[in-house]
Amino acid sequence: MSDRRAALESALRQIEKQFGKGSIMKLGEVSNIQISTASSGALALDIALGVGGFPRGRIVEIYGPESSGKTTVALHAIAEVQRQGGQAAFIDAEHALDPVYAAKLGVNIDELLLSQPDTGEQALEIAEALVRSGAVDIIVVDSVAALVPKAEIEGEMGDSHVGLQARLMSQALRKLSGAINKSKTIAIFINQLREKVGVMFGNPETTPGGRALKFYASVRLDVRKAESIKVGNDILGSKTKIKVVKNKVAPPFKVAEVDIMYGEGISREGSILDIGSEIDVVQKSGAWYSFNEERLGQGRENSKVFLKENPHIASQIETKVREYFSLNPSSVPEAEAEHDPEQDEEPTFDLE
């Protein structure tokens, strides 16, 4: 055994000499085995992902039908990374990013790096350069379907370009995956849906760009609208289901239900109420919601309004929920409140 041990030590020294220190190591010697994450900005999705958010140094694919909320989910992740002091980049291949909407979701558009490339090759080369810099914490590509190969752009309308996009994605991901892992960048690829022709049995839906992204992605999210949120005759948003169809860092197939409110994004208060009432942090009696014997409101929408007007209570509930699911409590936004200890009245909260 001593001869084998000596041979192994000699081989390890040779590998480190040739490829550099850290090129091979025992798994127990790795300083941080725990997966580092960044909150998705949606409490329900953090819980469904199993590790408290999107894993750093991994590839994430978000796909679903049109107007289902894919870009909204990605923008919330960007806003959360920026809130923690990170740098974000958005590669807008669809040329459709609305900066006003992004700002409403909490994105700091003054600091967001934006690229609107002409070709798929250009988009992926920009992504690679940003990842290899090691200075970008999250990068979003919107969308894979809009990454048009240069040959297709320069060709005639109607020319056949079979498999060009799939080859482009396959080559890019081969180059990107290692760099993404080393730089601990979260790489989010938004994708569309297509129908397979002639499928009689099984799911006819597929995503463009070939199979490479399906293999390289550590997390795949399927975003679907469930139903509209109405107050009277007015439609204010939609209940949306986000299914974790692939997860390499936690058990898959969990579903997060969130409220996407038009012009506001994912409702933080809605997730707090739903999950809080499921685990009895928030008590529900009939139509009334209450927390620590204080009534929040009658009906879900009224209770959401109350939590929006009282962010300190919302933060208390969210902290208890995160403790229950062993999630990172630092992801709870602090209520921006000024309180004078000499005053006996309730603290006032600036909602502007």
Curated annotation (Swiss-Prot):
GO terms for cellular component: cytosol. PROSITE patterns: RECA_1, RECA_2, RECA_3. The lineage of its organism: Bacteria, Bacillati, Bacillota, Bacilli, Bacillales. This is Protein RecA. It is found in: Cytoplasm. ATP binds at G64, P65, E66, S67, S68, G69, K70, T71. Can catalyze the hydrolysis of ATP in the presence of single-stranded DNA, the ATP-dependent uptake of single-stranded DNA by duplex DNA, and the ATP-dependent hybridization of homologous single-stranded DNAs. It interacts with LexA causing its activation and leading to its autocatalytic cleavage. Residues 335-352 have a biased composition (Acidic residues). Belongs to the RecA family. GO terms for molecular function: ATP binding; ATP hydrolysis activity; ATP-dependent DNA damage sensor activity; damaged DNA binding; single-stranded DNA binding. Disulfide bonds: none annotated. One of its GO terms (biological process) is DNA recombination. Keywords: ATP-binding, Cytoplasm, DNA damage, DNA recombination, DNA repair, DNA-binding, Nucleotide-binding, SOS response. Residues 328-352 are annotated as: Disordered.
